[in-house]
Structure formats: structure tokens, C-alpha cells
């Protein structure tokens, strides 16, 4: 039985925390920022925790976590 490949796109976008939760960064925060409000840009800088509904999909993409 061959090894399962890790999805490299997902591996670059998601990090596992010490408690086992999945941390990720929001999109839309790198360019075309003039039209976005100060509050929106500030909120985009923060990292976020993945919800339980999407956790199953990420675990399938990253089998060796």
C-alpha cells in the first residue's frame, strides 16, 4: 500500500496549534487595500481558528499531522 500524499497547498496555508486546533490566515489582505476600511484591514491581520465543520476536510488533506 503506497503512502498517502500530503496536499501541499493545504500544508502551506494551515498550521496546527499545540492544543490540536487548526490556525489559518484570512484571504483578501494583501493588495487592493485602498477601498477596504481600517477596521477590515486590521481584522484581516489576525489569524483565525478553523471551525469543526471544516476540520474533517483538512485532516483528509494533511494525513501526517
UniProtKB/Swiss-Prot annotation:
Instruction: Name a GO CC annotation attached to this entry.
Output: cytosolic large ribosomal subunit
List this protein's GO terms for biological process: translation
Please give the InterPro entries that the UniProt record associates with this protein.
Ribosomal_bL35, Ribosomal_bL35-like, Ribosomal_bL35_CS, Ribosomal_bL35_sf
Coiled-coil residues? none
- Give the start-end ranges of region Disordered: 1-23, 29-48
Keywords of the record, alphabetical order, are: Ribonucleoprotein, Ribosomal protein
MF terms per GO, please? structural constituent of ribosome
- The keyword Chaperone is assigned to this record: no
What residue spans carry the Basic residues bias annotation? 33-43
HAMAP family found in the cross-reference section: Ribosomal_bL35
The text of the family note is:
Belongs to the bacterial ribosomal protein bL35 family.
Name by which UniProt lists this protein: Large ribosomal subunit protein bL35
Taxonomy of the source species: Bacteria, Pseudomonadati, Thermodesulfobacteriota, Desulfobacteria, Desulfobacterales
Amino acid at each position: 500500500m503506497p503512502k498517502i500524499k500530503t496536499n501541499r497547498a493545504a500544508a502551506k496555508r494551515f498550521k496546527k496549534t499545540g492544543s490540536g486546533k487548526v490556525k489559518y490566515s484570512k484571504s483578501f489582505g494583501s493588495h487592493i487595500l485602498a477601498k477596504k476600511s481600517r477596521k477590515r484591514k486590521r481584522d484581516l491581520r489576525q489569524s483565525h481558528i478553523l471551525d469543526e465543520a471544516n476540520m474533517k476536510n483538512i485532516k483528509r488533506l494533511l494525513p501526517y499531522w
